[in-house]
């Protein structure tokens, strides 16, 4: 969205406004027909280089999540090209996705949780050893990057509905894929076709690595970048696609 925000610092500050707004009020949600006051909580991907910036933008509690570089962009590179993960801030609760296995129609992974829910106990920093819980996740959402989305959702639903992480995680098997997001087109053909809405360099870096990893043959990519919005991303997207795919078709 740099065509609107003009530069990264402005974009990052505007995003941080979401965290700053947490200090203004708690949320009032209608749950089971009743209005319930839900304490505000921030949720952040700890693999984001700006994670500490967002955390510092609010006085409210922030719960994080990470795969320690095992999914998305961080998992795409190895050796000297490996992405350096930012240091996890002290005294922040977070969950870690591990053993991520993505297949054609879904994924499974385990999660180590700091605590049993997103609720922060009083004097949390002084509580040692901290209580942990392990979850086993299965979902009909292909793509290892969805481990991020699932963990963020578990934290959010736990906070809003006042449910434990395990209660929320038990429902992930019922999740329905969103059309246009890693949608598999199966008409009996001898090859696999996937449709995804990815339209930015970061999303390309997220979806191509897991597909490349499990692709046994050649990988083709068909995409375009119509309109006159962000023209600077076009060559970057082409470079990323060319890195992971055998043939790239520009529409």
Name these PLM-found stretches.
Residues 168, 204-207:
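Hydrophobic side chains in well-ordered alpha-helices
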Residues 139, 197, 223-225:
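Short glycine-centered, acidic/aromatic-flanked micro-motifs in structured strand/loop junctions
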Residues 152, 199, 203:
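Conserved cofactor-binding/catalytic machinery of classical short-chain dehydrogenase/reductase
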Residues 177-180, 202, 209-251:
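Active-site beta-alpha connecting loops in nucleotide-dependent enzymes
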Residues 52, 202-205:
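Alpha-helical elements of the RecA-like P-loop NTPase motor core of helicases
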Residues 1-192, 216:
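Acidic, Mg2+-coordinating active-site environments of NTP-dependent enzymes
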Residues 1, 48-49, 200, 225-228:
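Short glycine-rich anion-binding loops that position phosphate/pyrophosphate groups of nucleotides
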Residues 193-199:
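Switch II (G3) loop of P-loop NTPases
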């Amino acid at each position: 969205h740099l065509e609107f925000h003009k530069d990264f610092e402005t974009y990052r500050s505007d995003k941080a406004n979401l965290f700053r707004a947490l200090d203004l009020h708690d949320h009032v949600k209608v749950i089971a027909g009743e209005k319930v006051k839900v304490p505000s909580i921030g949720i952040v991907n700890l693999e984001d280089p700006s994670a500490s910036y967002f955390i510092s933008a609010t006085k409210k509690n922030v719960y994080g999540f990470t795969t320690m570089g095992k999914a998305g962009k961080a998992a795409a590179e190895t050796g000297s090209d490996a992405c350096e993960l930012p240091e996890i801030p002290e005294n922040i609760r977070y969950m870690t996705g591990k053993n991520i296995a993505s297949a054609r129609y879904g994924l499974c992974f385990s999660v180590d949780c700091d605590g049993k829910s997103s609720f922060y106990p009083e004097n949390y920093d002084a509580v040692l050893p901290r209580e942990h819980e392990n979850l086993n996740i299965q979902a009909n959402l292909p793509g290892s990057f969805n481990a991020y989305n699932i963990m963020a959702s578990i934290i959010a639903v736990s906070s809003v509905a006042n449910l434990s992480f395990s209660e929320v995680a038990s429902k992930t098997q019922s999740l329905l894929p969103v059309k246009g997001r890693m949608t598999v087109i199966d008409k009996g053909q001898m090859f696999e076709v996937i449709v995804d809405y990815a339209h930015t360099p970061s999303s390309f870096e997220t979806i191509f690595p897991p597909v490349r990893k499990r692709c046994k043959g050649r990988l083709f990519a068909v995409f375009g970048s119509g309109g006159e919005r962000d023209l600077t991303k076009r060559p970057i997207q082409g470079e990323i696609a060319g890195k992971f795919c055998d043939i790239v078709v520009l529409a």
